[in-house]
């Protein structure tokens, strides 16, 4: 049986997973660093890298035990090798390459964004091509996923990522870290029409997005309010989340038009939303309705595979393993690595 070991360390989650050739997840361990970074209100790269160094060995032992797998049973080792916080990326990549060398097993360098992009093929086995909205704390872009290693970026944020906007607004409201889930929780209790926020470049006619102005508008509002109580916090969270939904819905329409100009597979109308923001139930509902209007089906991974995880890295490794796309051990990890720059 083919077993793929996946390692993820691009930000603040240390993750190790083992999957089979049949897309079965035997084990998927994630060691969160939220407690270590919460006091700073955000991820500290140096702390993250050191934590990966101390957690990876433990995570590997746990995943082997949970999956009843021996290291010698592993067929290949896939590890995030960019983009991301370079300290953590180097730690995970070096760990994987050391295992590869010691076990004499192939190594596969995985682009972290490709891991997110292919998650829906792991969970739903959808065919190529499909339209992807990659929405996380570090990235926000629409991508035409045409095949393995074949990606066309249709548009992206020109400033902040949508996940970063969630986290920063949560910090303004003194909510816990990470902020995205806290905003969603508070938004359920608030009035989404209480405050009207701007929707930057919503009528630009292209797939690019902007969230910096929205973030600034929230900060300006908070500074003008005399009192910030729970009701106000709930209303701001709801109004902010509503505005994000309006922006993304509008841009999905632009992305569909751009996507249909470059693909003729009109019988396979799938839109995938991946990345941490894909876990937001409100956005799932809004974007699902928008997709349905245009005859598309919105697909999003289960919540534990929306955020950073190693199962998606292992699956990307499986697709590359099946195509014999291995990586030399002297591969240099990258802090920046566009999906369009991936080579097969």
UniProtKB/Swiss-Prot annotation:
Annotated binding of substrate, by residue: 134-138, 167, 180, 280
Protein name (Swiss-Prot/TrEMBL): tRNA N6-adenosine threonylcarbamoyltransferase
4Fe-4S in keyword set: no
Protein family membership: Belongs to the KAE1 / TsaD family.
Keyword line: Acyltransferase, Cytoplasm, Iron, Metal-binding, Transferase, tRNA processing
Any GO CC annotation of this UniProt entry: cytoplasm
Highest taxon in the source lineage: Bacteria
């Amino acid at each position: 049986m083919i077993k793929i070991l996946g390692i993820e360390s691009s930000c603040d989650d240390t993750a190790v997973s083992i999957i089979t050739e049949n897309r079965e997840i035997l084990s998927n361990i994630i060691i969160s660093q939220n407690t270590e970074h919460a006091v700073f209100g955000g991820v500290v790269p140096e702390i993250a890298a050191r934590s990966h160094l101390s957690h990876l060995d433990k995570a590997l032992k746990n995943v082997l035990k949970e999956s009843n797998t021996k290291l010698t049973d592993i067929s290949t080792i896939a590890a995030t090798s960019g983009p991301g916080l370079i300290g953590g990326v180097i730690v995970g990549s070096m760990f994987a390459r050391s295992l590869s060398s010691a076990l004499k097993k192939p190594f596969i360098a995985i682009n972290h964004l490709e891991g997110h992009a292919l998650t829906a093929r792991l969970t739903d086995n959808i065919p190529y091509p499909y339209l992807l909205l990659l929405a996380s704390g570090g990235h926000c872009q629409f991508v035409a996923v045409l095949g393995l290693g074949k990606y066309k970026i249709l548009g992206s944020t020109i400033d902040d990522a949508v996940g970063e906007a969630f986290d920063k607004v949560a910090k303004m409201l003194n909510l816990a870290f990470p902020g995205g889930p806290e905003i969603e929780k508070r938004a359920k209790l608030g009035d989404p029409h209480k405050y009207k926020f701007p929707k930057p470049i919503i009528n630009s006619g292209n797939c690019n997005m902007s969230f910096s102005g929205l973030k600034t508008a929230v900060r300006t509002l908070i500074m003008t309010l005399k009192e910030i109580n729970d009701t106000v916090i709930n209303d701001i969270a709801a109004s902010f989340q509503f505005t994000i939904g309006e922006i993304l819905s509008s841009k999905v329409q632009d992305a569909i038009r751009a996507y249909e100009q470059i693909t003729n597979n009109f019988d396979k109308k799938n839109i995938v939303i991946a990345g941490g923001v894909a876990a937001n139930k409100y956005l799932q509902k809004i974007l699902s309705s928008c997709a349905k209007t245009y005859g598309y089906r919105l697909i999003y991974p289960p919540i534990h595979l929306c955020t950073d995880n190693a199962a998606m890295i292992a699956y990307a490794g499986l697709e590359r393993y099946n195509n014999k796309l291995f990586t030399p051990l002297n591969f240099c990890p990258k802090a920046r690595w566009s999906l369009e720059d991936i080579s097969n």
